[in-house]
Protein backbone atom coordinates (compact mmCIF):
# COMPACT_ATOMS: atom_id res chain seq x y z
CA UNK A 1 0.00 0.00 0.00
CA UNK A 2 1.60 3.31 -1.07
CA UNK A 3 2.61 5.55 1.72
CA UNK A 4 1.52 9.11 1.70
CA UNK A 5 4.31 11.55 0.95
CA UNK A 6 2.44 14.54 2.23
CA UNK A 7 4.04 16.24 5.24
CA UNK A 8 2.08 17.24 8.30
CA UNK A 9 0.76 20.73 8.17
CA UNK A 10 2.74 23.40 9.97
CA UNK A 11 0.99 23.88 13.27
CA UNK A 12 3.62 26.00 14.90
CA UNK A 13 1.44 29.04 15.07
CA UNK A 14 -1.64 27.17 16.17
CA UNK A 15 0.20 25.03 18.68
CA UNK A 16 2.14 28.01 19.89
CA UNK A 17 -1.07 29.90 20.43
CA UNK A 18 -2.69 26.92 22.06
CA UNK A 19 0.30 26.32 24.26
CA UNK A 20 0.79 29.95 25.16
CA UNK A 21 0.68 30.78 28.80
CA UNK A 22 -2.65 32.36 29.74
CA UNK A 23 -2.46 36.00 30.79
CA UNK A 24 -1.91 36.64 34.46
CA UNK A 25 -4.75 38.00 36.61
CA UNK A 26 -2.94 41.35 36.71
CA UNK A 27 -2.75 41.46 32.92
CA UNK A 28 -6.43 40.57 32.63
CA UNK A 29 -7.27 43.30 35.13
CA UNK A 30 -5.22 45.83 33.16
CA UNK A 31 -6.99 44.84 29.95
CA UNK A 32 -10.38 45.15 31.66
CA UNK A 33 -9.58 48.60 33.03
CA UNK A 34 -8.32 49.76 29.64
CA UNK A 35 -11.38 48.65 27.72
CA UNK A 36 -14.09 49.07 30.37
CA UNK A 37 -14.18 52.73 31.35
CA UNK A 38 -16.83 52.23 34.04
CA UNK A 39 -14.65 49.67 35.86
CA UNK A 40 -11.64 52.00 35.67
CA UNK A 41 -13.62 54.95 37.00
CA UNK A 42 -15.04 52.92 39.87
CA UNK A 43 -11.50 51.90 40.82
CA UNK A 44 -10.34 55.53 40.67
CA UNK A 45 -13.33 56.53 42.77
CA UNK A 46 -12.41 54.00 45.45
CA UNK A 47 -8.78 55.16 45.39
CA UNK A 48 -9.85 58.81 45.66
CA UNK A 49 -12.12 58.22 48.64
CA UNK A 50 -9.50 56.07 50.39
CA UNK A 51 -6.82 58.72 49.82
CA UNK A 52 -9.02 61.54 51.10
CA UNK A 53 -9.89 59.46 54.17
CA UNK A 54 -6.18 59.02 54.87
CA UNK A 55 -5.61 62.77 54.57
CA UNK A 56 -8.60 63.36 56.83
CA UNK A 57 -7.27 61.03 59.53
CA UNK A 58 -3.86 62.67 59.26
CA UNK A 59 -5.31 66.10 59.94
CA UNK A 60 -4.35 67.53 56.54
CA UNK A 61 -7.86 68.69 55.61
CA UNK A 62 -9.73 71.79 56.69
CA UNK A 63 -12.81 69.74 57.56
CA UNK A 64 -14.02 66.14 57.69
CA UNK A 65 -14.22 64.27 54.39
CA UNK A 66 -17.02 62.04 55.61
CA UNK A 67 -20.20 60.53 54.22
CA UNK A 68 -22.25 63.61 55.09
CA UNK A 69 -19.83 65.88 53.22
CA UNK A 70 -19.76 63.57 50.19
CA UNK A 71 -23.57 63.40 50.16
CA UNK A 72 -23.83 67.19 50.34
CA UNK A 73 -21.45 67.43 47.35
CA UNK A 74 -24.11 65.68 45.27
CA UNK A 75 -25.86 69.05 45.07
CA UNK A 76 -23.35 70.20 42.46
CA UNK A 77 -23.15 66.69 41.00
CA UNK A 78 -26.76 66.74 39.74
CA UNK A 79 -26.65 69.67 37.27
CA UNK A 80 -23.13 68.81 36.10
CA UNK A 81 -24.10 65.20 35.41
CA UNK A 82 -27.22 66.26 33.51
CA UNK A 83 -25.15 68.61 31.35
CA UNK A 84 -22.54 65.90 30.79
CA UNK A 85 -25.32 63.65 29.47
CA UNK A 86 -26.30 66.50 27.15
CA UNK A 87 -22.71 66.72 25.92
CA UNK A 88 -22.64 62.95 25.43
CA UNK A 89 -25.56 63.13 23.00
CA UNK A 90 -23.92 65.91 20.99
CA UNK A 91 -20.47 64.30 20.92
CA UNK A 92 -21.92 60.93 19.94
CA UNK A 93 -23.31 62.52 16.76
CA UNK A 94 -19.77 62.81 15.40
CA UNK A 95 -17.99 65.33 13.19
CA UNK A 96 -16.36 66.90 16.21
CA UNK A 97 -19.71 67.63 17.82
CA UNK A 98 -19.45 69.71 20.96
CA UNK A 99 -21.73 72.20 22.71
CA UNK A 100 -20.03 75.12 24.43
CA UNK A 101 -23.34 76.85 25.11
CA UNK A 102 -24.86 74.50 27.70
CA UNK A 103 -23.87 76.75 30.60
CA UNK A 104 -25.32 79.79 28.88
CA UNK A 105 -28.52 77.86 28.14
CA UNK A 106 -28.77 77.08 31.85
CA UNK A 107 -28.49 80.79 32.66
CA UNK A 108 -31.00 81.98 30.06
CA UNK A 109 -33.53 79.19 30.64
CA UNK A 110 -33.24 79.71 34.39
CA UNK A 111 -34.05 83.40 33.95
CA UNK A 112 -37.04 82.53 31.76
CA UNK A 113 -38.23 80.06 34.40
CA UNK A 114 -37.75 82.71 37.08
CA UNK A 115 -39.86 85.20 35.15
CA UNK A 116 -42.64 82.65 34.67
CA UNK A 117 -42.83 81.65 38.33
CA UNK A 118 -41.66 84.77 40.12
CA UNK A 119 -42.83 87.67 37.97
CA UNK A 120 -45.70 86.47 35.82
CA UNK A 121 -47.35 84.27 38.44
CA UNK A 122 -47.56 81.12 36.34
CA UNK A 123 -48.27 77.82 38.15
CA UNK A 124 -45.31 75.53 38.68
CA UNK A 125 -46.10 72.75 36.22
CA UNK A 126 -46.89 74.96 33.20
CA UNK A 127 -43.77 76.99 34.02
CA UNK A 128 -41.70 73.82 34.20
CA UNK A 129 -43.02 72.58 30.85
CA UNK A 130 -42.46 75.98 29.23
CA UNK A 131 -38.91 76.17 30.60
CA UNK A 132 -38.07 72.76 29.15
CA UNK A 133 -39.58 73.77 25.81
CA UNK A 134 -37.56 77.00 25.92
CA UNK A 135 -34.34 75.10 26.56
CA UNK A 136 -35.17 72.71 23.71
CA UNK A 137 -35.68 75.69 21.40
CA UNK A 138 -32.28 77.10 22.34
CA UNK A 139 -30.70 73.74 21.58
CA UNK A 140 -32.60 73.59 18.29
CA UNK A 141 -30.98 76.88 17.26
CA UNK A 142 -27.60 75.21 17.73
CA UNK A 143 -28.83 72.20 15.78
CA UNK A 144 -30.01 74.39 12.92
CA UNK A 145 -26.67 76.17 12.69
CA UNK A 146 -24.69 72.92 12.78
CA UNK A 147 -26.88 70.36 11.01
CA UNK A 148 -28.67 72.55 8.47
CA UNK A 149 -26.31 75.45 7.76
CA UNK A 150 -23.18 73.35 8.24
CA UNK A 151 -21.43 75.55 10.81
CA UNK A 152 -18.67 73.86 12.83
CA UNK A 153 -20.20 73.06 16.21
CA UNK A 154 -17.33 74.73 18.06
CA UNK A 155 -17.96 78.07 16.33
CA UNK A 156 -21.76 77.81 16.34
CA UNK A 157 -22.12 77.00 20.02
CA UNK A 158 -19.43 79.48 21.04
CA UNK A 159 -21.41 82.20 19.26
CA UNK A 160 -24.77 81.16 20.69
CA UNK A 161 -23.16 80.80 24.11
CA UNK A 162 -22.12 84.43 23.96
CA UNK A 163 -25.59 85.42 22.77
CA UNK A 164 -27.46 83.40 25.39
CA UNK A 165 -25.21 84.69 28.18
CA UNK A 166 -25.79 88.27 27.08
CA UNK A 167 -29.56 87.79 26.89
CA UNK A 168 -29.57 86.28 30.38
CA UNK A 169 -27.70 89.29 31.75
CA UNK A 170 -29.83 91.97 30.08
CA UNK A 171 -33.15 90.22 30.68
CA UNK A 172 -33.36 91.61 34.21
CA UNK A 173 -30.62 94.26 34.17
CA UNK A 174 -28.02 91.79 35.46
CA UNK A 175 -30.08 91.20 38.61
CA UNK A 176 -31.35 87.85 39.90
CA UNK A 177 -35.03 87.07 40.34
CA UNK A 178 -35.52 86.24 44.01
CA UNK A 179 -39.19 86.87 44.66
CA UNK A 180 -41.05 84.70 47.16
CA UNK A 181 -42.45 82.20 44.59
CA UNK A 182 -38.92 81.61 43.29
CA UNK A 183 -37.52 81.20 46.80
CA UNK A 184 -40.19 78.61 47.48
CA UNK A 185 -38.70 76.50 44.66
CA UNK A 186 -35.85 75.62 47.00
CA UNK A 187 -38.12 72.85 48.24
CA UNK A 188 -37.50 71.09 44.91
CA UNK A 189 -33.86 70.63 45.88
CA UNK A 190 -33.97 70.20 49.66
CA UNK A 191 -32.12 67.39 51.41
CA UNK A 192 -34.07 64.22 52.13
CA UNK A 193 -33.30 61.56 54.72
CA UNK A 194 -32.43 58.03 53.69
CA UNK A 195 -33.10 54.83 55.65
CA UNK A 196 -30.51 52.65 57.39
CA UNK A 197 -28.70 55.62 58.89
CA UNK A 198 -27.41 56.90 55.55
CA UNK A 199 -26.69 60.63 55.30
CA UNK A 200 -29.33 62.85 53.66
CA UNK A 201 -28.94 63.53 49.94
CA UNK A 202 -30.35 66.25 47.69
CA UNK A 203 -33.88 65.54 46.53
CA UNK A 204 -32.99 66.45 42.93
CA UNK A 205 -30.82 63.35 42.73
CA UNK A 206 -34.02 61.29 42.62
CA UNK A 207 -36.47 63.75 41.07
CA UNK A 208 -34.31 65.10 38.23
CA UNK A 209 -31.06 63.21 37.67
CA UNK A 210 -32.27 59.60 37.85
CA UNK A 211 -35.20 60.17 35.45
CA UNK A 212 -32.89 61.98 33.02
CA UNK A 213 -30.25 59.24 33.21
CA UNK A 214 -32.80 56.47 32.68
CA UNK A 215 -34.45 58.27 29.77
CA UNK A 216 -31.12 59.01 28.07
CA UNK A 217 -30.05 55.38 28.54
CA UNK A 218 -33.29 54.15 27.01
CA UNK A 219 -32.98 56.67 24.19
CA UNK A 220 -29.49 55.65 23.11
CA UNK A 221 -29.82 51.91 23.78
CA UNK A 222 -33.42 51.00 23.05
CA UNK A 223 -34.65 53.29 20.26
CA UNK A 224 -34.08 53.65 16.54
CA UNK A 225 -32.80 57.16 17.14
CA UNK A 226 -30.10 55.83 19.45
CA UNK A 227 -28.93 53.31 16.85
CA UNK A 228 -28.85 56.05 14.22
CA UNK A 229 -26.95 58.33 16.59
CA UNK A 230 -24.19 55.77 17.08
CA UNK A 231 -24.16 54.95 13.37
CA UNK A 232 -23.81 58.58 12.32
CA UNK A 233 -21.10 59.22 14.87
CA UNK A 234 -19.16 56.07 13.96
CA UNK A 235 -19.15 56.50 10.18
CA UNK A 236 -21.06 59.38 8.66
CA UNK A 237 -20.35 58.29 5.09
CA UNK A 238 -21.70 54.79 5.69
CA UNK A 239 -24.73 56.29 7.43
CA UNK A 240 -25.46 58.40 4.35
CA UNK A 241 -25.15 55.34 2.10
CA UNK A 242 -27.63 53.62 4.43
CA UNK A 243 -30.07 56.47 3.73
CA UNK A 244 -29.96 57.78 7.30
CA UNK A 245 -30.83 61.42 7.83
CA UNK A 246 -27.47 62.53 9.19
CA UNK A 247 -28.55 66.14 9.53
CA UNK A 248 -31.79 65.16 11.25
CA UNK A 249 -30.01 62.96 13.78
CA UNK A 250 -27.48 65.68 14.57
CA UNK A 251 -30.21 68.33 14.85
CA UNK A 252 -32.15 66.23 17.35
CA UNK A 253 -28.99 65.61 19.39
CA UNK A 254 -28.48 69.36 19.84
CA UNK A 255 -32.17 69.90 20.61
CA UNK A 256 -32.06 67.19 23.27
CA UNK A 257 -28.96 68.82 24.73
CA UNK A 258 -31.03 71.99 25.05
CA UNK A 259 -33.80 70.05 26.77
CA UNK A 260 -31.37 68.62 29.32
CA UNK A 261 -29.89 72.09 29.82
CA UNK A 262 -33.42 73.24 30.63
CA UNK A 263 -33.67 70.54 33.29
CA UNK A 264 -30.35 71.67 34.76
CA UNK A 265 -31.63 75.26 34.74
CA UNK A 266 -34.66 74.32 36.83
CA UNK A 267 -32.38 72.49 39.26
CA UNK A 268 -30.07 75.50 39.66
CA UNK A 269 -33.00 77.86 40.27
CA UNK A 270 -34.17 75.55 43.05
CA UNK A 271 -30.68 75.20 44.52
CA UNK A 272 -30.03 78.95 44.62
CA UNK A 273 -33.66 79.81 45.51
CA UNK A 274 -33.09 82.44 42.86
CA UNK A 275 -32.92 82.75 39.07
CA UNK A 276 -29.39 84.02 38.50
CA UNK A 277 -28.28 85.40 35.11
CA UNK A 278 -24.85 83.83 35.58
CA UNK A 279 -25.95 80.51 37.05
CA UNK A 280 -24.30 78.42 34.33
CA UNK A 281 -21.37 80.68 33.49
CA UNK A 282 -20.07 82.07 36.79
CA UNK A 283 -16.58 81.05 37.87
CA UNK A 284 -15.35 78.07 35.90
CA UNK A 285 -18.73 77.75 34.20
CA UNK A 286 -20.59 74.52 33.56
CA UNK A 287 -19.78 73.84 29.91
CA UNK A 288 -16.12 72.87 30.16
CA UNK A 289 -16.56 70.67 33.26
CA UNK A 290 -19.48 68.93 31.50
CA UNK A 291 -17.34 68.27 28.42
CA UNK A 292 -14.51 67.00 30.61
CA UNK A 293 -16.87 64.64 32.43
CA UNK A 294 -18.25 63.28 29.16
CA UNK A 295 -14.78 62.57 27.74
CA UNK A 296 -13.57 61.17 31.06
CA UNK A 297 -16.62 58.90 31.04
CA UNK A 298 -15.42 57.28 27.82
CA UNK A 299 -17.29 59.32 25.20
CA UNK A 300 -14.97 59.42 22.18
CA UNK A 301 -14.53 62.97 20.95
CA UNK A 302 -14.68 61.62 17.39
CA UNK A 303 -18.21 60.34 18.01
CA UNK A 304 -19.99 57.02 18.03
CA UNK A 305 -18.65 55.71 21.36
CA UNK A 306 -20.00 56.42 24.83
CA UNK A 307 -22.06 55.02 27.69
CA UNK A 308 -24.39 56.63 30.18
CA UNK A 309 -22.87 54.69 33.08
CA UNK A 310 -19.41 56.01 32.32
CA UNK A 311 -20.64 59.60 32.30
CA UNK A 312 -22.42 59.21 35.65
CA UNK A 313 -19.42 57.67 37.43
CA UNK A 314 -17.09 60.25 35.87
CA UNK A 315 -19.31 63.06 37.16
CA UNK A 316 -19.20 61.56 40.64
CA UNK A 317 -15.41 61.29 40.46
CA UNK A 318 -15.00 64.92 39.38
CA UNK A 319 -17.40 66.26 42.01
CA UNK A 320 -15.84 64.30 44.89
CA UNK A 321 -12.36 65.24 43.69
CA UNK A 322 -13.33 68.92 43.61
CA UNK A 323 -14.87 68.59 47.06
CA UNK A 324 -11.63 67.12 48.38
CA UNK A 325 -9.55 69.89 46.80
CA UNK A 326 -11.66 72.52 48.54
CA UNK A 327 -10.92 70.85 51.87
CA UNK A 328 -7.19 70.64 51.21
CA UNK A 329 -6.48 74.23 50.14
CA UNK A 330 -7.48 77.32 52.06
CA UNK A 331 -9.41 80.26 50.61
CA UNK A 332 -9.75 80.68 46.85
CA UNK A 333 -6.74 78.48 46.10
CA UNK A 334 -9.02 75.45 46.02
CA UNK A 335 -11.01 76.69 43.02
CA UNK A 336 -7.79 77.39 41.12
CA UNK A 337 -6.48 73.90 41.74
CA UNK A 338 -9.83 72.52 40.61
CA UNK A 339 -9.06 73.91 37.15
CA UNK A 340 -5.68 72.18 37.20
CA UNK A 341 -7.34 68.90 38.17
CA UNK A 342 -9.88 69.26 35.36
CA UNK A 343 -7.10 69.86 32.85
CA UNK A 344 -5.15 66.81 33.97
CA UNK A 345 -8.28 64.66 33.89
CA UNK A 346 -9.15 65.86 30.38
CA UNK A 347 -5.69 65.06 29.02
CA UNK A 348 -5.61 61.67 30.73
CA UNK A 349 -9.09 60.72 29.53
CA UNK A 350 -8.28 61.78 25.96
CA UNK A 351 -5.17 59.58 26.00
CA UNK A 352 -7.18 56.67 27.39
CA UNK A 353 -9.81 57.14 24.69
CA UNK A 354 -7.10 57.14 22.01
CA UNK A 355 -5.52 53.93 23.35
CA UNK A 356 -8.92 52.23 23.67
CA UNK A 357 -9.82 53.37 20.14
CA UNK A 358 -6.67 51.79 18.71
CA UNK A 359 -7.53 48.57 20.52
CA UNK A 360 -11.02 48.56 19.03
CA UNK A 361 -9.62 49.12 15.53
CA UNK A 362 -7.13 46.27 15.94
CA UNK A 363 -9.88 43.89 17.05
CA UNK A 364 -12.05 44.95 14.10
CA UNK A 365 -9.39 43.94 11.55
Language-model region placement:
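Cytosolic-side transmembrane-helix boundaries in multi-pass membrane proteins
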Residues: 2-54, 234-237, 241, 245-248, ...
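Single transmembrane alpha-helix segments in multi-pass membrane proteins
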Residues: 52-53, 67-120, 146-149, 292-308, ...
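Inter-helical junctions in multi-pass inner-membrane proteins, predominant
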Residues: 58-68, 173-175, 200, 220, ...
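Alpha-helical transmembrane segments within multi-pass membrane transporters and channels
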Residues: 121-161, 313-317
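Helix-loop-helix "hairpin" substructures at the membrane interface of multi-pass membrane proteins
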Residues: 122-123, 138-142, 196-276
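Transmembrane helix-bundle core of multi-pass membrane transporters
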Residues: 153-222, 252, 272-283, 329-331, ...
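Transmembrane alpha-helical segments in multi-pass inner-membrane proteins
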Residues: 276-343
Amino acid sequence: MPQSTSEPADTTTRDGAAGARPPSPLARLGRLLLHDRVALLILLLVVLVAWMKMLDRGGYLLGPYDAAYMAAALESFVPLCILALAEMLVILSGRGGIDLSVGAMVSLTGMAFGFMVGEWGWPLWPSLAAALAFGTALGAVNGFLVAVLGFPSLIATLATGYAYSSLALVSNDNAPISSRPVQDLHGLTSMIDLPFGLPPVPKQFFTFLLPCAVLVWLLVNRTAFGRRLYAVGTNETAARYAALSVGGVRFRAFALAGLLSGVAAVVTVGQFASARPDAGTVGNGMALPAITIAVLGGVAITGGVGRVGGVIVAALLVVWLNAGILLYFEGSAGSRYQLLALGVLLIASTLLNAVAGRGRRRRAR
